[in-house]
A protein has these predicted regions:
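A conserved helix-loop-beta module that forms one wall/lid of the active-site cleft
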Residues: 1-39
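A short linear hydrophobic-aromatic micro-motif
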Residues: 2, 25-28, 63-67, 134-139
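Generic hydrophobic alpha-helical segments
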Residues: 14-18, 53-54, 122, 175
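ATP-dependent carboxylate activation and anion-phosphoryl transfer catalytic cores
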Residues: 98-99, 113-181
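Phosphate-binding site of ATP-dependent enzymes
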Residues: 22, 35-126, 130, 141, ...
Length: 181
């Protein structure tokens, strides 16, 4: 997903940056956060209504600005990798009338089988990390058959381990294999 990164305490004209890219409906979220914390979606002309919250977020962390993709309404895919090896996937869906997929906003999740093409596209996102993470959750949506990365979660992501019987063992082996011998 095209993304504008705004660093902590940086002054940026979000409206001008978004307009230059042709975005009319945007999502603004912290670079570090979880559970939809301080995530806002709004039409660009409503930016003044959210500017105070965005400034508060920028006081102690950066933000990501992305175009709102209506594909999220059909669900966000989470593909889990342990030491670079695909393990399993979940589909997170928002409740009717919302865009947030987190359970605290009424979102649900379910096991899902994904094709090798999506696994390969999600795996390609991991190779851009500075080092291969022991675990990663690759979140995104599918548009026209293409996986669009929304977030690469590598710090304590929800991994849906209880929903896949083999996943806890895969995760444990990946961690064990990284420990000094």
């Amino acid at each position: 997903v095209p993304t504008i990164c705004i660093a902590r305490q940086e002054k940026a004209d979000i409206a001008a940056l978004a307009r230059a890219r042709g975005w009319n409906d945007i999502v603004v979220k912290p670079t570090i956060g979880g559970g939809g914390y301080r995530t806002y979606r709004f039409p660009l002309d409503e930016l003044p209504r959210y500017s105070g919250e965005i400034e508060q977020t920028l006081a102690d962390r950066g933000v990501l600005v992305q175009p709102f993709l209506p594909e999220i309404l059909n669900g966000e895919l989470s593909l889990l990798f342990f030491d670079g090896v695909y393990s399993h996937a979940a589909l997170k869906r928002p409740k009717a009338g919302d865009y947030r997929v987190q359970f605290q906003y009424g979102g649900t999740n379910e096991n899902v089988e994904v094709g090798e093409d999506l696994v390969a596209q999600a795996r390609a996102c991991i190779v851009h990390a500075p080092a291969l993470p022991v675990y990663a959750r690759v979140d995104g949506v599918v548009k026209d058959g293409k996986f669009l990365l929304m977030e690469l979660e590598v710090f304590e992501p929800l991994m849906f381990l209880s929903r896949h019987p083999e996943a806890p063992g895969r995760f444990a082996r990946a961690v064990r294999d990284r420990l000094p011998k």
